[in-house]
Design a protein with these regions (language model features):
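Structural motif
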Residues: 14-15, 146
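Active-site pocket-lining/capping segments in soluble small-molecule metabolic enzymes
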Residues: 1-6, 21-150, 157-167
Length: 167
């Protein structure tokens, strides 16, 4: 993930990139600083899941699966995910690690290590991070003002129903 204009300019000069997607962890002033200092078109996430890791550098997923997101394109790769339907509900596992259990009829999200619910000290909760979403609808005028070229809506690891709902 490139988080600054120097890195983006390097990829532009060395590989001729024309557009870069910034990680969703950057604040508006940081995005503006990048836009103002590179000839590369800048795309930002407008909607999607937030993460405690810098995008593309998920150490938790890489540890659990042996597959780093930068090299394999995704956190919690589908080939490492197992859904186990049992009489008392649904269990989700990533590379054999139990990520979450859902009661019968409870909505189940895609299993990621950072957003799993775990039993810690006898209590079941989101031990690392509660699921949260990025929604930049209110920032669209600012994105236009600072020169953002495009808005990205997360779709990888999402069902067609999810993509249809948010677009």
């Amino acid at each position: 993930s490139a988080t600054n204009y120097e890195a983006i300019n390097f990829y532009h000069e060395q590989f001729g990139i024309q557009r870069a997607v910034l990680p969703r962890v950057l604040a508006l002033p940081q995005i503006e600083h990048v836009v103002n200092n590179t000839p590369v078109e800048i795309e930002v996430f407008g909607y999607g899941s937030l993460c405690v890791m810098v995008e593309g550098r998920c150490a938790l997923s890489a540890y659990a699966t042996g597959l780093g997101p930068n090299q394999h394109g995704v956190c919690s790769p589908a080939k490492s995910v197992v859904w186990e339907e049992k009489p008392d509900g649904l269990s989700t596992r990533l590379a054999g690690y139990l990520i979450d259990r859902f009661a019968t009829g409870e909505r189940a999200g895609y299993p990621t290590v950072c957003k799993g619910r775990y039993v810690v000290g006898g209590e079941r909760y989101y031990a690392i991070e509660e699921p949260a979403s990025l929604d930049t609808l209110a920032l669209l005028p600012e994105f236009v003002r600072i020169g953002v070229a495009a808005i990205k809506i997360e779709g990888r690891q999402r069902s067609p129903a999810y993509v249809a709902e948010v677009t």
